[in-house]
């Protein structure tokens, strides 16, 4: 089905519509050989809380953004190249159901669908697109993926020392190697993690020791008081929210345009 859609008029219209919804701030998505495979709303676990995001699956990239006006306007476009994407199932945990992890070299995060069927559809289509892309032979799979950040709300104390209570003075930080929420005293050093960022990024003391032992020769970086570290703990995902959070509605059920993937059993 995807091969038949390549450079078809209907596929071109779909991609042009996605570009129009992101406006001038989004990147050009209509390129030769690219196919829009599916689209829909997923709940992304952001640093502060879960929030709805619009996702578009192409045969070579996964695109998502903030919802400004449903099906009409999106912003803060993010593009993940599928050769670096890996999906991992998440077991249901209380109210957090129908979720999985999207792993990439630079950023990894959890997403949730409205139903188990939609979850399986998304995972099947993403895995199939990744497999097809790699089998074509001109892309290589990623060998390292970023850690999933522990949400702020799941840590009232530093997850390294277990003593520092977070408040307005004692801010939360995230280790870029393990994803834990840590205090400033337990994450004062930086280390270059090539798949995450070209410059040294904040890591906790435990990870700094293990990374230094595994990669001798890297110099320690001690930030001065008041200076911001590279990749500081800020997330545009938590800013300028328009539509609020919550699970996907029936109006935002995913639509997939390829018909050659076996549908999950209901």
From Swiss-Prot:
Keyword match tRNA processing: no
Biased composition (Basic and acidic residues): 221-234, 256-266
Domain of life per record: Eukaryota
An example Gene Ontology biological process: endosome to lysosome transport
Gene3D superfamilies: Pleckstrin-homology domain (PH domain)/Phosphotyrosine-binding domain (PTB) (2.30.29.30), Zinc/RING finger domain, C3HC4 (zinc finger) (3.30.40.10)
InterPro entries assigned: PH-like_dom_sf (IPR011993), PH_domain (IPR001849), PH_domain-containing_F (IPR051765), PH_Phafin (IPR037871), Znf_FYVE (IPR000306), Znf_FYVE-rel (IPR017455), Znf_FYVE_PHD (IPR011011), Znf_RING/FYVE/PHD (IPR013083)
Keywords: Metal-binding, Zinc, Zinc-finger
This protein's record includes keyword Iron-sulfur: no
PH domain: residues covered: 35-131
GO molecular function: phosphatidylinositol binding; phosphatidylinositol-3-phosphate binding; zinc ion binding
Residues reported to bind Zn(2+) 1: 158, 161, 183, 186
GO terms under cellular component: early endosome
Annotated segments matching region Disordered: 213-266
Residues annotated for Zn(2+) 2 binding in this entry: 175, 178, 204, 207
Zinc finger (FYVE-type): 152-212
PANTHER family xref list: PLECKSTRIN HOMOLOGY DOMAIN-CONTAINING FAMILY F MEMBER 1 HOMOLOG (PTHR46280:SF3), PLECKSTRIN HOMOLOGY DOMAIN-CONTAINING FAMILY F MEMBER 2-RELATED (PTHR46280)
Protein name per Swiss-Prot or TrEMBL: Uncharacterized protein ZK632.12
Lineage: Eukaryota, Metazoa, Ecdysozoa, Nematoda, Chromadorea
């Amino acid at each position: 089905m995807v091969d038949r859609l390549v450079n078809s008029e209907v596929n071109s219209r779909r991609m042009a519509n996605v570009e129009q919804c992101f406006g001038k701030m989004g990147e050009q998505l209509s390129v030769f050989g690219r196919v829009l495979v599916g689209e829909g709303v997923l709940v992304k676990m952001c640093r502060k809380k879960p929030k709805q995001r619009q996702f578009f699956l192409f045969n070579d990239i996964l695109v998502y953004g903030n919802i400004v006006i449903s099906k009409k306007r999106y912003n803060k476009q993010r593009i993940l190249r599928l050769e670096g994407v890996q999906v991992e199932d998440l077991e249901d945990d209380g109210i957090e159901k129908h979720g999985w992890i999207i792993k990439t070299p630079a950023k990894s995060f959890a997403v949730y669908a409205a139903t188990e069927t939609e979850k399986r559809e998304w995972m099947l289509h993403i895995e199939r697109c990744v497999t097809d892309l790699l089998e074509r032979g001109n892309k290589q799979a990623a060998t390292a993926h970023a850690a999933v950040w522990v949400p702020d709300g799941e840590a009232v104390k530093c997850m390294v020392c277990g003593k520092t209570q977070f408040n307005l003075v004692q801010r939360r930080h995230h280790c870029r190697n393990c994803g834990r929420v840590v205090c400033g005293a337990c994450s004062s050093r930086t280390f270059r993690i090539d798949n995450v960022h070209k410059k040294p990024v904040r890591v906790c003391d435990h990870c700094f020791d293990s990374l230094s032992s595994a990669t001798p020769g890297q110099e320690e970086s001690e930030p001065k008081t008041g200076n911001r570290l590279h990749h500081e703990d800020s997330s545009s995902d938590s800013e300028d929210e328009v539509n609020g959070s919550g699970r996907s509605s029936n109006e935002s059920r995913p639509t997939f345009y390829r018909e050659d993937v076996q549908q999950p059993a209901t």
